[in-house]
């Protein structure tokens, strides 16, 4: 894992090409591929497709990267949107508390936490530990920087997902603007498109590599004993 400082700039600077704006998302799909460290930043690599009916088997519009907090925030917005549409409750995971760089004190020492990539492979998220308030300088123990925070959110990597997810509705449940709203309000795809960054050959190669780091279990046990983030030693 690495820093997520690019998230701050991503939230204020989108791709910026109005000619590429997409207003109706009905035909599009997104395929999250991996969570990797690229150019010293933790990013989600994903491909976008213009014909969702082909289930991401055709040529992609492109393969891009977005800062992990940016992508995860959009992913959660999409889950909330889906839940609202199905009239079910949605509870945000504990990890959502660390979308921004968040201060914690452990055994009298200052740390900062933020969602990023896990150390044990490219298909998982983690809450990472940093030494500075911008979450740019990783704080490691035996080479690992994942904190002991419950990982209660998983991205469905390598799964083709339509940008617009329809649910069965009775005519009495919807008004005239429902379909227009659904077609234009696709939180995950809209945000991923707006804040997309270039993912070159090196970036795409990293996304194809799924390698677990040897010795993770031992390092994890050390972290569990050192960073008890929900123990009495924590001062918020």
Regions found by a protein language model. Name each.
Residues 1-236:
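Mature extracellular/luminal domains of secreted and GPI-anchored eukaryotic proteins, especially small
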């Amino acid at each position: 894992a690495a820093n997520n400082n690019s998230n701050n700039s991503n939230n204020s600077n989108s791709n910026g090409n109005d000619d590429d704006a997409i207003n109706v998302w009905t035909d599009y799909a997104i395929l999250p591929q991996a969570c990797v460290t690229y150019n010293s930043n933790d990013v989600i690599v994903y491909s976008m497709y213009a014909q969702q009916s082909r289930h991401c088997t055709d040529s992609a519009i492109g393969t891009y990267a977005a800062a992990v907090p940016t992508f995860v925030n959009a992913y959660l917005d999409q889950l909330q949107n889906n839940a609202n549409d199905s009239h079910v409750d949605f509870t945000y995971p504990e990890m959502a508390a660390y979308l921004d760089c968040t201060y914690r004190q452990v055994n009298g020492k200052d740390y900062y936490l933020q969602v990023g990539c896990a150390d044990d492979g490219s298909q998982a998220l983690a809450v990472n530990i940093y030494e500075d308030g911008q979450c740019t300088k990783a704080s490691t123990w035996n080479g690992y920087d994942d904190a002991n925070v419950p990982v209660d959110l998983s991205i469905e990597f390598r799964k083709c997902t339509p940008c617009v997810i329809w649910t069965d509705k009775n005519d009495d449940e919807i008004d005239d603007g429902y379909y227009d709203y659904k077609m234009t309000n696709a939180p995950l795809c809209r945000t991923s498109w707006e804040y997309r960054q270039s993912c070159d050959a090196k970036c795409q190669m990293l996304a194809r590599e799924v390698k677990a780091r040897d010795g993770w279990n031992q390092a994890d046990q050390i972290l569990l004993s050192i960073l008890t983030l929900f123990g009495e030693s924590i001062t918020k």
